[in-house]
Amino acid sequence: MPILKHFQELRSRLLICLVFFIICFLISFYFSHLIWFLLSLPIKEISRLELINLAPAEALEVDFKMSSIAAFILAAPICFYQFYAFCAEALYPTEKRIIITLTLTSTLCFLIGVSFAFFTVLPLLFHFLAEYNAEAKALWSQNAYISFLIRLELAFGIIFQMPVIAAFLSYFKIIKSNFFIQHFRIAIFVLAFISALITPPDLLSMIFMMGPMLLLYLITIIVNRIFGKGA
C-alpha cells in the first residue's frame, strides 16, 4: 500500500476515535450526576465529612473532569480496535495473538487494581483521613476529592501491570528469571518513593499504597520465574 494511503487510513481511524470520544463525553456529561454518585461511594458512610466547592465554576470543572475520564474509558475499546486494525496487515499471526493476549491480560489486571483500590483501599483511607482530627469537621473540596481519587485509581491500575510486564520481559528473554529477586532492595526503595509521590504526605496513605505494591511485587517474582524458565 502506498505511503499516502497509509496516512489517509490513519487519518480516518483517528477521526473515528475522536468522534467516538466526543459522543462518549457528551453522554457521560449528561449522566454526570450518576457518575458522581458512583465515585462518591467510598465516602458515603463518613458522617463527619462534607464536600464543598471553593470556586464559582468548581462544580462544572468536576463534571468535565469526570466526563472526560468516563469518555476515555468508554472510547478506549474502539480506539484500540482502530489501532489494531491499522497495524494488523503488517503483523504475523503469532504477533497478533501476543498483542491480543497482552491487551486482554493488561486490561483485566488494570480493572482488578482499580476495583481493589475503589472497594478496599479508598474507603479505609478516606475514613481515616476524615476522622483523624476528632476536634474539627472535615471539609474537603469536591475537585480535590475527585482529583485525588482519580490519581490513586490510576496508580493502582498501573501498579497492577507489574505481573504482565514481568511475563512479557521474561518470555522474550529480555530479563533473567531471577531479575526481580536480585533487585529486591532497589525495588523496595522505588516502590516506597512511588507511594510517597502519589499519596498524601502521611504515613498511613503510604502504607495503604505500599502494601498492595509489595504483594504485587511478590507475584511478579513468581511470574518472572515461571515465564523465564518456560520460555
Where are these regions (language model features)?
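Membrane topogenic/interface segments and analogous intrinsically disordered interaction regions
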Residues: 1-231
